A protein has these predicted regions:
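A ligand-binding cleft/hinge motif common to bilobed small-molecule-binding domains
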Residues: 183-198, 284-313
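Flexible hinge/capping segments at coil-to-helix
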Residues: 212, 221-242
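Acidic, polar ligand-binding/catalytic clefts
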Residues: 179-217
């Protein structure tokens, strides 16, 4: 078994530098990369330095030299290998790899927002026909895809800021955005939690909803726990460590609804009051890395990290808009794109998603949210209503 002789930790001096680039072709999001972590990921996945070099498009000699350089800089061995055995990262390298991946995943929405700002500046400089639509939304993996779709097909730039459902709706009321994304389960029984949280933020008549997508939320667990978990209470029953979502997010409301539905208290769920994350992907990474045993999220996030997915609830993802802004050109373009066949086809190919019942259509809130209390109409004056009929009957000598 072989380790490379490395420098002492006191010799290590490293700095972090972020750069961005313009490239020809389609937009590819805001994925950050680094040669060291690309190297470690390839070795972890393939178990061979030679195969890792092939997958990264470089020579064995170059990759080996790069590995030795990084070991000298970090003051720690990074790879363990011996003749005839799989190469694997050291414990230090694995800790480093997971820590970097977690930090990158946590920062992804903010980096995506920065990329979006830069892309908007370039688009506006190149073509002034591009419409800009400010969006604040609960995190959703389909929205990032929608952003690319409307940019390519509708000359529309979605300036998306991901945050909790409640904060997004507050931003809409404060006119920080034209559209706010939030999600609610297709369950009448969810009214106690969701209506309490959303009633102060959504006003029938003032707010309108636009159908965007349907998605399934469920438990994400590592495969060694898959046989134990069939329902939400199983997490508490088996004492699995749970990673929560931040307060104010729609998924946190869903978790609280599920706890209420199954008569669970915060103390029954290990980790409920501890570790929290802000996106589905960050929750999935926490589970995959072993920081937690279970979390709630969408199926696409679970599959991205090789986790088992236990479906729990189907949700509607809505885009809210003030009634007075429905005629805005950017909102009209968005509705048209959502109603088009391209968006429906995208959702059909995204695990755990499907098209909304009426994508792109402007919905009346009391119809879209069946648990929302309907506004009772004022009782009509019966005598006033009868007066015209009586007059008409008298004129024609009819009895009513």
């Amino acid at each position: 078994m072989r380790h490379t002789k490395v420098a002492t930790k006191s010799e290590t001096s490293l700095g972090l530098h972020l750069r961005y680039a313009f490239e020809a072709g389609e937009q590819h999001g805001a994925t950050l990369g680094n040669p060291l972590f690309d190297l470690l990921s390839a070795v972890l996945e393939l178990g061979s330095i030679r195969h890792a070099a092939q997958s990264l498009g470089c020579s064995y000699r170059y990759l080996w030299g790069s590995l030795r350089k990084w070991e000298q800089k970090l003051g720690e061995p990074l790879i363990i290998w011996s003749q005839g055995q799989r190469a694997r990262p050291t414990q230090f390298a694995e800790r480093l790899l997971w820590a970097e991946r977690r930090a990158r995943t946590r920062m992804q929405p903010h980096i995506e927002a920065l990329r979006s700002d830069l892309a908007r500046v370039v688009d506006e400089a190149r073509d002034q026909r591009h419409q800009l639509l400010a969006v604040q939304a609960s995190h959703d993996m389909a929205l990032s895809i929608l952003q690319k779709h409307v940019a390519a097909t509708a000359d529309l730039h979605l300036d998306i800021r991901f945050q909790g459902s409640q904060d997004a709706l507050r931003g809409l009321s404060d006119r920080q955005c034209l559209v706010a994304g939030f999600h609610v389960p297709v369950l009448r029984g969810a009214a106690p939690v969701f209506a309490k949280a959303l009633k102060p933020l959504l006003k029938p008549g003032r707010h309108k909803l636009i159908g965007c997508s349907r998605r399934t939320q469920g438990l994400m667990v590592r495969r060694e726990h898959a046989a134990l978990i069939r329902s939400f209470p199983d997490v508490a029953r088996h004492g699995l460590r749970f990673v929560n979502r931040q307060v104010g997010s729609g998924t946190r409301m869903l978790i609280d609804h599920l706890m209420h539905e199954h008569s669970l208290n915060p103390g029954d769920l290990p980790g409920y009051g501890g570790l929290t994350e802000e996106t589905h992907v960050a929750v999935a990474l926490c589970v995959a890395s072993g920081l937690a045993d279970a979390g709630v999220g969408v199926e696409a996030a679970a599959l991205e990290f090789g986790l088992q997915f236990v479906p729990l609830v189907e949700e509607n993802y809505f885009l809210a808009c003030l009634k007075g802004n429905l005629g805005h050109a950017a909102v009209q373009r968005l509705c048209a794109a959502l109603a088009g066949p391209g968006w429906c086809e995208i959702l059909k190919n995204l695990p755990g998603y499907r098209p909304a019942l009426e994508p792109g259509r402007v919905l009346v809130m009391t119809q879209a949210l069946p648990w929302w209390p309907k506004i009772k109409s004022k009782p009509k004056n019966r005598k006033a209503n009868l007066a015209p009929r009586i007059a008409a009957a008298e004129a024609t000598h009819l009895v009513i």
